[in-house]
Amino acid sequence: AAGKAISTGGPRRIIFFMQNQGFDPKTCIPDGMKSSGSLAKAKLPEPVKALEPYKERLHIINGLHGTHTSPSHSAFFGALGGYRGSDGVPPSGPTIDYELSKVLPQTLLPHLCIGMDSIENMKTKPTIATLSASGAGQPIFMHSNPNHLYQLLYGGISTGDIRRQHEARSNVLNQIEQLAASKGRSLPTGDQQRYGQYVQGFQDVNGLRDRLDTVADHLRKFAPTVDDRYTNPEFETDWHDALLDLGISALTSGITNTLTIGSGRGQIFGAWKGLGVEQQGHN
């Protein structure tokens, strides 16, 4: 019954925003609100003031916790999986964002993850898997370099350098997939399963690119404009903004139905120089 209800009406879209350091409830609960009630006449606190125009459609759920997943800053995969998690520990099961993406009406990309970090970390590790998973031992990578993500989503409808880089990357990935698939057949049975996940990753990327090519005309209406934030970011927040633009465009265009945004990418990160926050940690 739940599945039937969720598949009717307009398109459903879900966004998970993960902040691994936690936050004070006072940053989202209006002053004087002690029990459940309408937000129509409430004044939202400064940190969520941007949601003021939408507060009559807004629900704030207070009191949820994940202390069973980790006693520290981040539970990594456990935060969305509901199980114990910690740094360097692979997922022991699927996460709720992935499971919900399967229940919603099918899209070209079932689930998109983007991660925001310091500019240095995003450049040296443009993809990382710490928060989402499709199953035990099956992490889902999040994208942190907006240039790479733009090529993945909109490279097929681009021109100039972006198009050339997209075509070159596509050719390389196709060749790697073919080579990897052929080499894996000679591995022992136990290793073949693990190696198969590696090959499947290339198949998923190449398959997504082919599916996106079939709706190129539609995607042109939603592709963000590439500007200096992509190629010459002054602060990490320039890339954060570009990643958010890409994530929202993927939702509105119908590329995906579920977006997971990892602030800090599941790790300990707190410097936002573009917002005037220079220090990191317990300051």
Residue ranges and their predicted role:
Residues 1-283:
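Ligand-binding pockets and gating/stacking loops
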